[in-house]
Amino acid sequence: DQLLKLHAKGITFHGVIAADDSLALGALKYAREMKLRIPEDLAIIGYNNSMLVNCCDPELTSIDNKLETLCQHLITTLMGVLGGSEMPKKTVFSGELVKRGTTK
């Protein structure tokens, strides 16, 4: 709906980065309705690298936020704190762009 509203206002765009893979599927639907070629006319990137990325054609490029790694680290840190161990005050996790068919 939001992409249709932007289009109706005359706003043009060549890419969409969605906050979630399910929202990126909405961008795929928009592209089909507008007869846009993916990724030539419109590139689409989702977020979470969920199971949804393989359920569409073309398959969705997505940012993998490494949620499983984050959760494992959280449990290890929590167990360390509860056990009285000195734990790092800060840990940085980097996501990974998993390129598939919705980007060049």
For each predicted feature, which ranges?
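Helix-loop module immediately N-terminal to the HCX5R catalytic loop
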Residues: 1
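Flexible loop/turn connectors
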Residues: 4-104
